[in-house]
Every structure is written in structure tokens, then in C-alpha cells.
Amino acid sequence: MAVADINKSEVIKQFARGANDTGSPEVQVALLTTRINELTPHFKANMKDHHSRRGLLRMVSRRRRLLDYLKSNDADRYRALIEKLGLRK
């Protein structure tokens, strides 16, 4: 299930660093977090859906790599993003 276009554009507006920013780490992490949060109820209801779970784990891994990149290059932006998204660290 993909993120709805309206929801996606709202997330991009909220986390963009500029007017046409769609590729910054903040936007990418926010979009991945939105997709992960939308898929979580599916896996609670369908525990044996291992094929889709693999895709979820890829998204989580990709988000982790983007967060590591952001943390190594700009720790202040990293902390602000983690706080804004409500992630654990």
C-alpha cells in the first residue's frame, strides 16, 4: 500500500528544507516513517505475511542508513528530525 499523494505532499511540505526539496534526508526519512507506520497495522493482523515483512525490513534499514548519514554530517538536524518524528533516539 502506497502513501496517498495528498498525505505524501503534506509530509514533503512539512519536512522540506526549501520550496522544491523532495530529496533531502529529512524528507526521505519522513516519507519512509509514514510508510512504515501505515504498514504496521497490516503486520499485526497478518503475522504470516513474511514476503511483505521483508519489504518492511528493507524500509526500516534504509531509514536507519539515512539517519546514520544525517547524524554523521549534521547532528543538530538529526536530533531535530528524531524529535519531530517521535523516533526513539
From Swiss-Prot:
SUPFAM superfamilies: S15/NS1 RNA-binding domain. Pfam families: Ribosomal_S15. One of its GO terms (cellular component) is cytosolic small ribosomal subunit. GO terms for molecular function: rRNA binding; structural constituent of ribosome. The keyword Ribosomal protein applies. InterPro entries: Ribosomal_uS15, Ribosomal_uS15_bac-type, uS15_NS1_RNA-bd_sf. SMART domains: Ribosomal_S15 (SM01387). One of its GO terms (biological process) is translation. Keywords: Ribonucleoprotein, Ribosomal protein, RNA-binding, rRNA-binding. HAMAP family: Ribosomal_uS15_B (MF_01343_B). Part of the 30S ribosomal subunit. Forms a bridge to the 50S subunit in the 70S ribosome, contacting the 23S rRNA. Belongs to the universal ribosomal protein uS15 family. One of the primary rRNA binding proteins, it binds directly to 16S rRNA where it helps nucleate assembly of the platform of the 30S subunit by binding and bridging several RNA helices of the 16S rRNA. Forms an intersubunit bridge (bridge B4) with the 23S rRNA of the 50S subunit in the ribosome. PANTHER family: RIBOSOMAL PROTEIN S15, BACTERIAL AND ORGANELLAR, SMALL RIBOSOMAL SUBUNIT PROTEIN US15M. This is Small ribosomal subunit protein uS15. It comes from Cupriavidus necator (strain ATCC 17699 / DSM 428 / KCTC 22496 / NCIMB 10442 / H16 / Stanier 337).
